[in-house]
Design a protein with these regions (language model features):
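N-terminal accessory targeting/assembly segments
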Residues: 1-102
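Short alpha-helix capping/helix-loop boundary micro-motifs
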Residues: 11-16, 46-52, 112-123, 156-160, ...
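Short, surface-exposed secondary-structure boundary micro-motifs
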Residues: 18, 32, 68-69, 87, ...
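Metallocofactor- and cofactor-centric catalytic cores in central/energy metabolism, strongly enriched
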Residues: 36, 44-46, 68, 153-157, ...
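Short, compositionally biased
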Residues: 40-46, 76-87, 143-163, 182-196
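P-loop NTPase nucleotide-binding/switch module
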Residues: 95-150, 166-226, 240-243, 278-297, ...
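P-loop NTPase catalytic core
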Residues: 217-218, 224-549
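C-terminal amphipathic alpha-helical interaction region
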Residues: 535-590
Length: 590
């Protein structure tokens, strides 16, 4: 069915003669067949959001509806891929039309010609329901792609075979309950605005290990959780997001560059293939899907990119994998919503954002979770969503930050004052929080011992005491404080500089596992306890601050992974001896 354009306003096109079209249908606009999506219908008039540049388009141009909603292709070949916001493969587009994307270019999202080795798991005669696994394809060295029955189908398998197939060839035939024979391929399509179904949602109870000490120890996120990384420009949001994408102990990472600089996506493409996953030893790119929707691409496609990314992530979650979606940045996505809302002449909300901003953000974050996947084998999968927020001027009272804070359960607030002091990650320990601490405590107690959470609480207490002591120090100076308070300031400095600070560009320090984090924090707190005992016996605080072991603790995080256990034990032993010697001398002086 086709209609005619009557108005063009930037990415918004108004067309008439589309009485039989539906909301969310994909349309092709004009002679160049630009991709668009119907936002609203009124009679036979449709407001269409066009995902490509509309210059040169005018009234009278033809609009053709496809009759299908905005969907993504799901199948083998997505891992290591780099897509734009509407799942067009950028590498294939370069091969077809060169470095500049021409308007209306059509390239299948998944390679339809490439052959994959399919190993059948199901057998003829098996009764299957949506989500059941038909077979597997070894997509990369680390990802075993499970080919599933589409979620809406059920029936009996009448034929299935292993072998070499492309994604459009029939691998099995399903006889449905109404007697129809349906051919099944390795390719599925799913509308991006609709969450993929699951059987049951569970409270998240396993932590996501990111290798970043301030995140894992102080403000942990659970697998299946939601987190926001708000911060002003230059505070290190993108580096935090890159660190999460590099080192998180998940099976698949979907990285959405939504409206950010092209250089940042280039960094990912340059670094990830060279970096090795500490758990598998393979290149990080072999578990990553990239969606690049940079700031110079059409604004409307930003709005689609987040939905595209999370739909791809849900597909891998349905296989029983732990998946992380990292969106950088949701503020740019909200700005795209604001622009389209303004063009539609809708009633603006706070700061010009549409009134439905909070509900759209919630739709994104609520698709995260730890779930029992559909299918008869009770697979468990998780989808963790992390979104960066870029509030203008670092003002966390603006609408996107406030709406995000109401939805997410982990808030890593980046602070420009810490970034200017070269303290990275610049996560402010006084304004950040994690609401998963209680639900993760049983896991920490079982795997790391109850002292891990106790040490975390002690360290947070020391940092809070430091903040209140700093006000006094500014008035009367450090020397006016008692020895105990001076020790609190010194230990807080050790926690900040020797534990929380982490160098993302230093191979040894970029990733730190839980056991190492526990030992390092335990060593700093042990220094605190031993020094307090020594001060009580009359030892000089200044002498205690200058022991050789104090400097060794400062260098402990740069010890190679294979040596750290022995080195940390040696530092602990040296520290105990050196403090005991000063304590004995302090007692003798009295």
């Amino acid at each position: 069915m086709s209609g005619k354009v009557v108005k063009v306003s930037g990415p918004l096109v108004v067309a008439t003669g589309l009485a039989d079209a539906n909301m969310s249908d994909v349309v092709r606009v004009g002679p160049q067949r630009l991709i668009g999506e119907i936002l609203t219908m009124k009679g036979d008039t449709a407001n269409i959001q066009v995902y490509e540049e509309t210059s040169g388009l005018g009234p009278g141009a033809e609009v053709e509806t496809t009759g299908a909603p905005m969907s993504v292709e799901l199948g083998p070949g997505m891992i290591e891929g780099i897509y734009d916001g509407i799942q067009r493969p950028l590498e294939k587009i370069v091969e077809k039309v060169g470095a500049c994307i021409t308007r209306g270019v059509e390239v299948p999202a998944v390679d339809h010609e490439k052959k994959w080795e399919f190993n059948a798991v199901a057998k003829v005669g098996d009764q299957v329901i949506g989500g059941d696994i038909l077979g597997t394809v070894q997509e990369t060295a680390v990802v075993l792609h499970k080919i599933m029955v589409p979620p809406t189908m059920r029936g009996t398998i009448t034929s299935i075979q292993s072998g070499s197939f492309n994604v459009t060839e029939t691998i099995a035939t399903l006889k449905t309950e109404d007697g129809r024979e349906v051919p099944l391929t390795m390719l599925q399509k799913w509308p991006v605005r609709v969450g993929r179904p699951y059987t049951k949602k569970y409270p998240p109870k396993r932590p996501l290990c990111s290798g970043q000490r301030i995140i894992d120890t102080m403000f942990p996120i659970a697998k299946g959780g939601t987190a926001a990384v708000p911060g002003p420009f230059g505070s290190g949001k993108t580096v935090v997001q890159h660190q999460l994408a590099k080192w998180s102990d998940v099976d698949i990472v979907v990285y959405i560059g939504c409206g950010e600089r092209g250089n940042e996506m280039t960094d990912v493409l340059r670094e990830f293939p060279e970096l090795k996953d500490p758990r598998t030893g393979e290149s990080l790119m072999k578990r990553t899907v990239l969606i690049a929707n940079t700031s110079d691409m059409p604004v409307a496609a930003r709005e689609a990119s987040v939905s595209t990314g999370i739909t791809i992530a849900e597909y891998f979650r349905d296989m029983g994998y732990d998946v992380a979606v990292i969106a950088d940045s949701t503020s740019r996505w909200a700005e795209a919503l604001r622009e389209m809302s303004g063009r539609l002449e809708e009633m603006p909300g706070e700061e010009g954002y549409p009134a439905y901003l909070a509900s759209r953000l919630a739709q994104f974050y609520e698709r995260a979770g730890s779930v029992e996947c559909i299918g008869s084998d009770e697979r468990r999968g998780s989808l963790t969503a992390v979104g960066a927020v870029s509030p203008p001027g670092g003002d966390l009272s603006e609408p996107v930050s406030q709406a995000t804070m109401r939805i997410v359960k982990v808030f890593w607030a980046l602070d420009s004052s810490l970034a200017y002091k070269r303290h990275f990650p610049a996560i402010n320990w006084l304004s950040s929080y994690s609401l998963y601490l209680d639900s993760l405590k049983p896991w920490f107690d079982e795997n790391l011992g109850p002292e891990f959470m106790q040490d975390r609480t002690k360290a947070m207490g020391i940092l809070q005491n430091e903040a209140s002591l700093n006000e006094i120090v500014q008035l009367v100076g450090k020397d006016a404080l008692g020895a105990g308070d001076q020790l609190t300031l010194e230990v807080a400095r050790m926690v900040r500089e020797d534990f929380l600070q982490q160098n993302a560009f230093m191979d040894v320090d970029s990733f730190s596992d839980y056991e190492r984090q526990k030992k390092l924090l335990g060593m700093i707190l042990s220094y605190d306890v031993l020094c307090r005992d020594a001060i009580a016996k009359g030892a000089s605080a200044q002498e205690l601050f200058q022991i050789p072991a104090r400097e060794q603790i400062g260098r402990a995080k740069s010890v190679p992974a294979e040596e750290y256990a022995a080195v940390y034990d040696q530092i602990q032993s040296d520290m105990e001896q050196q403090i005991a010697a000063i304590a004995a001398k302090g007692g003798d002086d009295e």
